[in-house]
Regions:
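Short helix-capping/linker turns of helical repeat alpha-solenoids
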Residues: 5-6, 21-22, 35-38, 51-53, ...
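Alpha-helical segment of the N-proximal tetratricopeptide repeat
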Residues: 6-36
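Hydrophobic face of amphipathic alpha-helices that form TPR/SEL1-like repeat modules
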Residues: 10-11, 16-17, 44-51, 55, ...
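Structural signature of tandem alpha-helical TPR/SEL1-like repeats
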Residues: 19-28, 56-65, 92-101, 128-139
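Canonical positions in the second alpha-helix
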Residues: 32-33, 67-69, 104-105, 141
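TPR/TPR-like (Sel1-like) alpha-helical repeat modules
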Residues: 100, 104-107, 111, 115, ...
Length: 143
């Protein structure tokens, strides 16, 4: 999605407000951009709903925003979708869906996806325990 000059300024200001923990202001700035289909703004909205930052915690809304962002190939949202499916947060718990999304994150080089999937295999969390696969993923992540 191409942003005009004002929208770029709103995005940057919204991200800065989020970083500075001015969650209500971040919501005001990022929400219109998310509604217009901006993937990063959608991801940030998901995180805000997921954690109750500036808005009441709402796992269903978080999953909706995360999926919209992930479907636009926003890489951090791939990890977010994996986490949501792993935990059953806003979606039905589904280890195979979690693996699918974490694998996309791994392909993009996301260390968080590597380590989280490694822990799933190490602990047998929704999957059959596989210490060798866990070790391979941890090495890939630099551990």
């Amino acid at each position: 999605m191409n942003l005009n000059e004002d929208e770029i300024m709103d995005l940057n200001s919204g991200l800065k407000a989020l970083e500075d923990k001015h969650f209500t202001r971040a919501l005001q700035l990022l929400s219109p951009l998310a509604e217009k289909g901006h993937a990063e703004a959608q991801h940030r909205m998901a995180v805000m709903y997921q954690n109750g930052l500036g808005i009441h915690r709402n796992e269903t809304a978080a999953a909706l925003w995360m999926k919209l962002s992930a479907d636009q190939d926003y890489e951090l949202a791939w990890h977010g979708m994996g986490f949501m499916y792993m935990e059953g947060e806003g979606v039905d718990k589904n280890a195979q869906e979690a693996i699918k999304w974490f694998s996309k994150g791994i392909d993009a080089g996301l260390i968080g996806s590597m380590t989280t999937l490694a822990m799933m295999y190490k602990e047998g969390n929704g999957v059959e325990k596989n210490p060798q696969e866990a070790e391979r993923l941890l090495k890939m992540a630099g551990f």
